[in-house]
């Protein structure tokens, strides 16, 4: 059911109405019989657009709705806004303070009197004028309360208040209100408001009526209403025509339909977001399950197979490996690794594993090489398989901890570092003495590391370093550097890696880890020096070349960054061409970083070449050897 009253005058001087007046309707809603939920309301702002009238000579309306409280009901009751009774300037009327711009009248208010009533003589005088008519709203409801307000214009030019009648019963009918104009006597220079009202303002101001005829005809004819007014003005009841009610009903139905459409659209969008979230959560769970799967069964026949089997489906082998039957593939792979030819090293290690799936050392070097070739996911799978075959492989544990750190699996990184201490003959007694430490032996997932777990593992490493005294264990210092990196203590991590480098100054992987920690600590210039040193030792170290390009981007050296990315891609492709490998292990991360650098250089044609993967065009553009 709808019930509403809309009348607002916007005056130039004294109360002059115009055709572009703003109408504000406060929508109040009630649920249940004989009660009203004052805490649920909908506010709507409606503005008339001048100079564009419809066929019925009604100004076109644009409407926007806003949810005042948390829930929007489907059948609102329209009630006038408290703002309609506010005066912009000083008034002699005694008004009650209003604390909200869109306050809602509650059933506890029997009367809202904002100004003194006008005199009866003035009302009758104005009533006699044909251009100024009064109107009323007749409510048909049983046992309903009635709220009436009157206002008078006095003193300085004011906004003209309105007289309204609210029926709080849910079974009500909205009927027509004509313009109710109250004119007060003026205190200065005797300017009556009736003389300042023009005929254009009377004809330009249009009424907007709302109706919701949901009751049967007997209810409409059998109801009674009372008009409780404390003003001296007389309200004339005007019965609306059936055609007008039908039109008003269409307007109300259109508003309800629009509200329902907005609600349905919101629900559809919400469902889509929830569906996307569930999809990615499921994908994440599947990826984690895949990473933990037993890749090779203990079946002896499966171990002797040379082809790719279902037991090895967690790691994606190259299907056209030219070295699949190469004798001594593992030794040849180690030779290529020393030369810095990472893509070919990967092919030889895969061939060695296909020849002997239980070769833990081949899995170890395959994982380490994949990480250096900027393929972290494949590295994690290979290192996990190595540890399944050889749980005390310390190099694999440390490399796995680094890969977990790079992929954001901080809890798993802590677990791997703790297992490194546990499997190390020199330090495993420390774990036994701290057997009660919480959370150190549980399987972890991709989430921010628990502070208690991280601190517990750091205590183990610090105690082990203290036991060593002046002797520096580079592997222990490397693990300590990773732990400090996880906790964001980059300066302490830098100290740990530098300590390890004092023992292994030619370890290019340590120089790369030092550079990454410097870069994460906002020391990109020093990081460039560390990466450069790593590349001097191992020119084919693709990961360090990629990291160097990232630091160049951070320093604003975009051309140098592009040059490093192209060099890394060229190394991967050159190795493939020499060995006639149709599908090289080229990292998508490098292409993504290359596109970022090219976009920062404002080179759209080169950016398009990067999108197409046209490496030759890019190499020629930067004068690099193919």
UniProtKB/Swiss-Prot annotation:
Keyword annotations from UniProtKB, A to Z: Cytoplasm, Membrane, Phosphoprotein, Repeat, TPR repeat
Broad class of the protein's primary localization: cytoplasm
One Pfam entry name: TPR_8
Quaternary structure and interacting proteins, as annotated: Interacts with RAB8B. Forms an obligate 4:4 complex with HCN2. May interact with the C-terminal PTS1-type tripeptide peroxisomal targeting signal (SKL-type); the relevance of such interaction is however unclear. Interacts with HCN3. Interacts with HCN4 with a 4:4 HCN4:PEX5L stoichiometry; reduces the effects of cAMP on the voltage-dependence and rate of activation of HCN4.
Compositionally biased tracts (Basic and acidic residues): 181-198
Role noted for this protein: Accessory subunit of hyperpolarization-activated cyclic nucleotide-gated (HCN) channels, regulating their cell-surface expression and cyclic nucleotide dependence.
UniProt name for this protein: PEX5-related protein
Gene symbol of the encoding locus: PEX5L
Localization (cell): Cytoplasm; Membrane
Ranges of the TPR repeats in the UniProt entry: 326-359, 360-393, 395-427, 474-507, 509-541, 543-575
């Amino acid at each position: 059911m709808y019930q509403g009253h809309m009348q607002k005058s916007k005056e130039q001087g004294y109360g002059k109405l115009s055709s572009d007046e703003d109408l504000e309707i406060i929508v109040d809603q009630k649920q249940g019989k004989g009660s009203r939920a004052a805490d649920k309301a909908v506010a709507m702002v409606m503005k008339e657009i001048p100079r564009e009238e419809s066929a019925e000579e009604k100004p076109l309306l644009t409407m926007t709705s806003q949810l005042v409280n948390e829930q929007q009901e489907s059948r609102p009751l329209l009630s006038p806004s408290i703002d309609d009774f506010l005066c912009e300037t000083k008034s002699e009327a005694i008004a009650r303070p209003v604390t909200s711009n869109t306050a809602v009248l509650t059933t506890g208010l029997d009367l809202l009197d904002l100004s003194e009533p006008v005199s009866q003589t003035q009302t009758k005088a104005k009533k006699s004028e044909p251009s100024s008519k009064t109107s009323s709203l007749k409510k048909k409801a049983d046992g309903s309360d009635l709220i009436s307000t009157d206002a008078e214009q006095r003193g300085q030019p004011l906004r003209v208040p309105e007289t309204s009648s609210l029926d709080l019963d849910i079974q009500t009918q909205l009927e027509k209100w004509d313009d109710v104009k109250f004119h007060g006597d003026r205190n200065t220079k005797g300017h009556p408001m009736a003389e300042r009202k023009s005929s254009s303002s009377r004809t330009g101001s249009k009424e907007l009526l709302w109706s919701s005829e949901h009751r049967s005809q007997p209810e409409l004819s059998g109801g009674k209403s009372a008009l409780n007014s404390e003003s001296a003005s007389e309200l004339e009841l005007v019965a609306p025509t059936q055609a007008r009610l039908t039109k008003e009903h269409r307007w109300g139905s259109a508003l309800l339909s629009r509200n329902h459409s907005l609600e349905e659209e919101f629900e559809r969008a919400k469902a889509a977001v929830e569906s996307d979230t569930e999809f990615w959560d499921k994908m994440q769970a599947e990826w984690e399950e895949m990473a933990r799967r037993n890749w090779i069964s203990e079946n002896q026949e499966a171990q002797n197979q040379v082809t790719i089997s279902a037991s090895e489906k967690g790691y994606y082998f190259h299907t056209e490996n030219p070295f699949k039957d190469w004798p001594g593939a593992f030794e040849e792979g180690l030779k290529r690794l020393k030369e810095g030819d990472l893509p070919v090293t990967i092919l030889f290690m895969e061939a060695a594993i296909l020849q002997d799936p239980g070769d833990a050392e081949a899995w170890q070097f395959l994982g380490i090489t994949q990480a250096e070739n900027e393929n972290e996911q494949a590295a994690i799978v290979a290192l996990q398989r190595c540890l399944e075959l050889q749980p005390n492989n310390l190099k694999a544990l440390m490399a796995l901890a680094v890969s977990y750190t790079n992929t954001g699996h901080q809890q798993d990184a802590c677990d791997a570092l703790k297992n490194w201490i546990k499997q190390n003959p020199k330090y495993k007694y420390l774990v036994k003495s701290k057997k009660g430490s919480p959370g150190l032996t549980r399987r972890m997932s991709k989430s921010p590391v628990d502070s208690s777990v991280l601190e517990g593992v750091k205590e183990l490493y610090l105690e082990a370093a203290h036991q060593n005294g002046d002797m520096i264990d580079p592997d222990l210092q490397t693990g300590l550097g990773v732990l400090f990196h996880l906790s964001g203590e980059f300066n302490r991590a830098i100290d740990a890696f530098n300590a390890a480098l004092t023992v292994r100054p030619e370890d290019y992987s340590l120089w790369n880890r030092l550079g990454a920690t410097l870069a994460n600590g906002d020391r990109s210039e020093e990081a460039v020096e560390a990466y450069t040193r790593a590349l001097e030792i191992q020119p084919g170290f693709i990961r360090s070349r990629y990291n160097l390009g990232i630091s160049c981007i951070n320093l604003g050296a975009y051309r140098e960054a592009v040059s490093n990315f192209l060099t890394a891609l060229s190394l991967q492709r050159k190795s493939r061409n020499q060995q006639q490998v149709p599908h090289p292990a080229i990292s998508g991360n490098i292409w993504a970083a290359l596109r970022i650098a090219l976009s920062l250089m404002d080179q759209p044609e080169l950016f398009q070449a990067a999108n197409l993967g046209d490496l030759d065009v890019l190499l020629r553009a930067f004068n690099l050897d193919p």
